[in-house]
Regions:
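Structural motif corresponding to alpha-helix initiation and N-cap regions
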Residues: 42, 53, 128, 148, ...
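ABC transporter nucleotide-binding domain
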Residues: 87-174
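ABC transporter nucleotide-binding domains
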Residues: 1-102, 107-121, 127
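A generic structural signal for secondary-structure junctions
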Residues: 9, 15-18, 57, 118, ...
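Structural motif detector for alpha-helix initiation sites
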Residues: 6, 131, 200-203
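Short, charged/small-residue-rich alpha-helical element at the C-terminal edge
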Residues: 140-214
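Generic structural signal for individual residues within well-ordered alpha-helical segments
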Residues: 10, 25, 32, 84, ...
């Protein structure tokens, strides 16, 4: 409802679900602060930035304390700071017992929030299950290292597919998780290893493999 003010829109949904206007107004002020919405409750929704409009949409959805929520791309238009704000509030709702279904292409958000996920390609399910179990099912075929060992020494190990720069370290892709033992032995030859993280692929990487590349 773009032509309504923030207050008018939120009050409409709150009263629609049986909430008293006085309670809803007090709750709206609280949510405006919690989500750091820029503007006044008398501002029209159409005048808000995309990010602030997204926050108001969430407030309209949760102000009456629903037990079941469906959120469609809740982090669209938000910068990292505001994404974190929204994510924390969604986590809080989850902790309070709300059942939440949300669709998103933000795999980082999915990984942080979801206990269970379903990935679709052209309307067909390609993956479904507990988030951690899905990640582990792909094997621990990636290693992040911060070490002076050369790319050539790493690539000489049978089972190392690639070595790519990542931040101040490097990402090593393996054919098999067991190759990680040899990589560690090579990296540890000089003694101290600042960082060695042998992990399962992220959901973002799995998404690219299964959905975009499938």
């Amino acid at each position: 409802y773009q032509k309504l003010t923030i207050e008018e829109q939120v009050m409409y949904f709150a009263e629609l679900h049986g909430m008293k206007r006085t309670d809803a107004k007090a709750s709206l002020q609280d949510w405006m602060k919690r989500l750091d919405v820029v503007g006044k409750t008398t501002d029209k929704v159409q005048k808000l930035s995309k990010g602030n409009a997204q926050k108001v949409q969430l407030i309209s959805t949760v102000i009456f304390h629903p037990e079941f929520l469906i959120l469609d791309e809740p982090f669209t238009g938000l910068d990292p700071v505001n994404t974190e704000l929204m994510m924390n509030e969604i986590k809080h709702l989850k902790q309070e017992g709300a059942m939440i279904i949300f669709s998103s292409h933000n795999m980082s958000g999915v990984e942080k929030l979801s206990d269970h996920l379903t990935m679709l390609r052209h309307g067909e399910t390609v993956l479904s299950g507990a988030t951690n179990e899905i990640r582990e099912s792909f094997g621990r075929t990636e290693i992040y290292i911060e070490s002076p060992v050369s790319d050539a020494d790493l690539l000489a190990i049978d089972g190392v597919v690639s070595v790519e720069p990542q931040g101040i370290g490097r990402q090593v892709l393996l054919t098999d998780a067991e190759v990680g033992r040899q990589v560690f032995s090579t990296v540890a030859q000089d003694g101290y290893v600042p960082v060695f993280a042998h992990t399962a692929p992220t959901l973002d990487e799995i998404f690219r493999r299964e959905v975009q590349g499938g």
